[in-house]
């Protein structure tokens, strides 16, 4: 609960600063990289979260690890360290993404199929989904052989289940 509140407050402030400096996309990309590292690297997560590691050490580490980032992104990360909020990075990034997606009219769509669709099929699906939603689609494909054939599309809270598995289950229930 606290992480979500802190994340929202900081994400809104950071987005506003990024927007004023015309750095919204750059910061979006940087925060995604930081988030992936935070989720996937235990040492990084431990360093960020550990209360006994001094702020200056954390800032030095961030500047070294993310040296390819532009100064603006590094300054934002160091600001989060200074305010003892880097450990809330998941909430900050999640909220920043929500703001970014809303303002840029982007929607995440998860599509699950029994087999990997071709690039042509993916392009056609994206085109149809963009027409349906009126937004740019960020498509994530998942493979699950248990659905037999067809597909399951998840757009936010809406699920469109056109799988053969669901149809068979419906027939079996009678």
From Swiss-Prot:
Where do transmembrane segments lie in this chain?
A: none
Q: Name one GO biological process term.
A: sodium ion transport
Q: Where is the signal peptide?
A: none
Subcellular localization: Cell inner membrane
What InterPro entries does the record point to? ATP_synth_OSCP/delta_N_sf (IPR026015), ATPase_OSCP/d_CS (IPR020781), ATPase_OSCP/dsu (IPR000711)
Q: What does the entry list under GO cellular component? A: plasma membrane; proton-transporting ATP synthase complex
A GO molecular function assigned to this protein is: proton-transporting ATP synthase activity, rotational mechanism
The membrane topology of this protein is: Peripheral membrane protein
Q: Does the keyword Transferase apply?
A: no
Query: Which of UniProt's keywords are assigned here?
Result: ATP synthesis, Cell inner membrane, Cell membrane, CF(1), Hydrogen ion transport, Ion transport, Membrane, Sodium, Sodium transport, Transport
Q: How does it assemble?
A: F-type ATPases have 2 components, F(1) - the catalytic core - and F(0) - the membrane proton channel. F(1) has five subunits: alpha(3), beta(3), gamma(1), delta(1), epsilon(1). F(0) has three main subunits: a(1), b(2) and c(10-14). The alpha and beta chains form an alternating ring which encloses part of the gamma chain. F(1) is attached to F(0) by a central stalk formed by the gamma and epsilon chains, while a peripheral stalk is formed by the delta and b chains.
> Family assignment?
Belongs to the ATPase delta chain family.
Which HAMAP family is this protein grouped with? ATP_synth_delta_bact
What this chain does, per the record? F(1)F(0) ATP synthase produces ATP from ADP in the presence of a proton or sodium gradient. F-type ATPases consist of two structural domains, F(1) containing the extramembraneous catalytic core and F(0) containing the membrane proton channel, linked together by a central stalk and a peripheral stalk. During catalysis, ATP synthesis in the catalytic domain of F(1) is coupled via a rotary mechanism of the central stalk subunits to proton translocation.
Protein name per UniProt:
ATP synthase subunit delta, sodium ion specific
Species for this entry: Ilyobacter tartaricus
